[in-house]
Amino acid sequence: MTRKDILKEVLSLEGNNWLLELPTGTGKSKIALEKVKSLGGKTLLLVVNRNVHKQNWTDEIKKWWSNCNMKITMTTYVSLPKYAGKYDCAIFDEAHHLSERCREALCSFDIKHSILLSATVSNKLKDELIEVFDDLTLYKKDLRDVIENDILPDPKVYILPLNLRADFPTEVIMKNPKAKGKLIESSWALRWSYMKQKTNPVRVHCTQRQYITDLDNQIEYWKKRYLRSRSEIFKNKWLRLCNDRLKWLSDKKTPYVQQILIHLGEYRTLIFCNSIEQTEMLGEYCINSKNKESIEHLEAFNEGKIDHITACNILNEGMNLCNCQVGIYANLNSSDTIVKQRMGRLLRHKNPVIIVPYFKNTREEELVNKMLENYNPKLVTIIDDYKKIKI
């Protein structure tokens, strides 16, 4: 199987609506444009996740269909309802963003042919899409399939287990932060002497390991409350704490990632970060939603003018990277979709390398074990020192 074989199979698909579930890096944009080209028509609706992704599609159209004379309407999922009307064709990029609001809005659209693109779509969403798009044809290729067929390269993976500090109280936990009384300073050992009272705020000094233990306990508490009550308030509290935990763990890896960067030297590197602040801490050329120079940095990277970029969310999907060899996961994510999308950012290099530092005996360890299911075990190396990384 080759890219040409996939394209040939997609072009031969009959019907009016198609969901193409293809790994990032297989050329979904080109395949979709070729399908639209084969259908004919005069109007095309192109829906993307973010405004910044519009330029990527503009470049793809120039590259693969320079003589296109269709009238193209480009919008985001947020603005989709504003563009209700009649179209010959529609491309829904990253179709897993077709929310209930967007699906309801499609009742006001008259679209002859729809092409839905995504790297991963949940079974629940597939069922919902089948209800919206008449006779939806599903076409899927798994990531391992395309790697084993040499369409995408098999990445070399370095796993670097780390330990949270348990020897010195470097962290602070605030209890009763809204209380109006005098602030109480407490050690970890004495915390229960003060935490049951609600009059005074308590600042507990603790180690990194103790901090994550407290956070784990809070998460378990709110999870149980939600499972008993099904209260949306409790659910939101539980999920917010889960996000806080991953962000905190990611922040604690910043100095380790900085050491890895120094070790790698001039290899072309992308760092997946948890926040805008972390992108700024880990690199001069950061790509995030607040940086007005993000597109310029991306273009400079693709042109080979710079070798290191950092990103927060914006590069998970919908953006092309040229010749990026090394990916460092400063931030881990529980979403299988994001895991596969990030991997696809790197598989455009012929010898990709993925580096995953994580803290042992934390939620991160569970996520790493899940990630390993996507990798060739023969190419996975567990190291105890970043200096053992060899590109």
Question: In which residue ranges do the predicted regions lie?
Answer:
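Conserved pre-motif I regulatory segment
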Residues: 1-21
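Conserved Walker A/P-loop ATP-binding site and its immediately adjacent core
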Residues: 24-61, 125, 276-277
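Inter-Walker segment of RecA-like/P-loop motor cores
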Residues: 47, 51-86
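Conserved helicase ATPase core of P-loop NTP-dependent helicases/translocases
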Residues: 55-59, 268-272, 277-319, 338
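A short beta-strand element within the Helicase C-terminal
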Residues: 87-91, 308-312, 316-333, 338, ...
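Post-DEXD/H (motif II) to motif III coupling segment of the RecA-like Helicase ATP-binding lobe
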Residues: 97-157
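Conserved interdomain linker/interface between the two RecA-like ATPase lobes of SF2 helicase motors
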Residues: 140-267
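Conserved segment of the helicase C-terminal RecA-like domain
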Residues: 345-373
